[in-house]
Curated annotation (Swiss-Prot):
Keyword Repeat: no
UniProt keyword list: Acetylation, Cell membrane, Cytoplasm, Endoplasmic reticulum, Fatty acid metabolism, Hydrolase, Lipid metabolism, Membrane, Nucleus
Protein name: Acyl-protein thioesterase 1
Biological process annotations from GO: fatty acid metabolic process; negative regulation of Golgi to plasma membrane protein transport; protein depalmitoylation
Amino acid sequence: MCGNNMSAPLPAIVPAARKATAAVIFLHGLGDTGHGWAEAFAGIRSAHIKYICPHAPVMPVTLNMNMAMPSWFDIIGLSPDSLEDETGIKQAAENVKALIDQEVKNGIPSNRIILGGFSQGGALSLYTALTTQQKLAGVTALSCWLPLRASFPQGPIGGVNRDISILQCHGDLDPLVPLMFGSLTAEKLKTLVNPANVTFRTYAGMMHSSCQQEMMDIKQFIDKLLPPVD
């Protein structure tokens, strides 16, 4: 099982300031934890939204000479033709779907949940949104790619998220996941879901990281899709 069973500490959470009627589930990148992203969301929070930043389980990562680190699934390489950890990706997606189910049980409908992530976490958020039967409000995918892209149809996906809103962000100087992968991913996404709902934003001078303007764009995207209901 390579430890991919969410046997990780409980998520970092930014609770809603009043009754939570919407949620953002955001998945960190390779080797990171949810804490830094929880802090970032605390800086752009809206009162009725709960922000959930889970921590990946620790596992050996092929890309990093089998060193053990927090990782949602194994990464073998970062080029478009690298082998992919299909079993690990699918298992990780099931774990994210279980997190979404948990929020639904807590009283937040899935169509009031935005899934997002950075780098490896962004890749997992895209894969999960495109394969789940849970209708989601949107995806915010940062500095990432679509994993197992050959497993998707040539035309639009079936299922509940055909019209999902996707905000994809990428730095134009990203040395790890080059901008080209991001733009190829955006083009692929436009064939899988309603292309009018896919937004691809690039940030001048940004490397494999985030920036203030990107966080403001994310806030605008979240607040538009998850307005207060009361």
